[in-house]
Amino acid sequence: MAQAQYAGTGRRKNAVARVRLVPGTGKITVNSKDVEEYIPHADLRLVINQPFAVTSTEGSYDVFVNVNGGGYGGQSGAIRHGIARALLQVDPDFRDSLKRAGLLTRDARMVERKKPGLKKARKASQFSKR
């Protein structure tokens, strides 16, 4: 019999993560690398594990992730969003706790575009009255 697989797609800033959950030991693989090797910051690895902590399913699923776009922070947020969506497929009863923790909401904050005549999105040259 085929092993159960659960999929979820997560997005954050410019990063898109396609996540697969397979019942296992809790190993996380990101773009064919171990999560410790791919994401060097320990606090961002904690962000990735938040959905498992909220649903108390740490160590129950192996996670396989394909992620592209963005930097470490955006990719970690996208992986977290994808894992939360995949856990919903595992057990729909997780929805309440995941929603309360804010893990199912797509963070809509994006980089503001640079405006013409300004140095950055909002930074202008110093104003001179005379």
UniProtKB/Swiss-Prot annotation:
<dbReference type="Pfam" id="PF00380">
    <property type="entry name" value="Ribosomal_S9"/>
</dbReference>
<dbReference type="InterPro" id="IPR023035">
    <property type="entry name" value="Ribosomal_uS9_bac/plastid"/>
</dbReference>
<dbReference type="InterPro" id="IPR020568">
    <property type="entry name" value="Ribosomal_Su5_D2-typ_SF"/>
</dbReference>
<comment type="similarity">
    <text>Belongs to the universal ribosomal protein uS9 family.</text>
</comment>
<dbReference type="GO" id="GO:0006412">
    <property type="term" value="P:translation"/>
</dbReference>
<dbReference type="InterPro" id="IPR014721">
    <property type="entry name" value="Ribsml_uS5_D2-typ_fold_subgr"/>
</dbReference>
<dbReference type="InterPro" id="IPR020574">
    <property type="entry name" value="Ribosomal_uS9_CS"/>
</dbReference>
<protein>
    <recommendedName>
        <fullName>Small ribosomal subunit protein uS9</fullName>
    </recommendedName>
</protein>
<keyword id="KW-0687">Ribonucleoprotein</keyword>
<dbReference type="GO" id="GO:0022627">
    <property type="term" value="C:cytosolic small ribosomal subunit"/>
</dbReference>
<dbReference type="GO" id="GO:0003735">
    <property type="term" value="F:structural constituent of ribosome"/>
</dbReference>
<dbReference type="InterPro" id="IPR000754">
    <property type="entry name" value="Ribosomal_uS9"/>
</dbReference>
<dbReference type="GO" id="GO:0003723">
    <property type="term" value="F:RNA binding"/>
</dbReference>
<keyword id="KW-0689">Ribosomal protein</keyword>
